Amino acid sequence: MLKFAVLCFLVIMASTFAQKCGDQVCGAGTCCAEYPEIHCKRVGQLYDICVDSEATKDSGNHLFFCPCDEGMYCDMNSWSCQKKTSGRSE
């Protein structure tokens, strides 16, 4: 019985943290990107092409690319993910 309760808890937690994206559900480390179709895409890593994390469509999805992973920011001059430095305020 305890195993069943733990399994139910894990399923509920997974569905809470997942993002619905068209017919898919995006998990951790991904975002829902649109163009040419809606699909789950990995969040930006160092030097990946990115979009500002605030740039979302009305649907909450990102257009073209995902924002950068934690600890990084999207440099809008180069449109690439860069590491945050201690002197940078976001």
UniProtKB/Swiss-Prot annotation:
Expressed by the venom gland. It holds the Pfam family MIT_LIKE_ACTX. It is found in: Secreted. One of its GO terms (cellular component) is extracellular region. Belongs to the MIT-like AcTx family. It comes from Hadronyche infensa. Disulfide bonds join 21-32, 26-40, 31-66, 50-74, 68-81. Transmembrane segments: none annotated. Its main location: secreted. The modification Pyrrolidone carboxylic acid is found at residue 19. The lineage of its organism: Eukaryota, Metazoa, Ecdysozoa, Arthropoda, Chelicerata. This is U1-hexatoxin-Hi1a. Gene3D superfamilies: Lipase, subunit A.
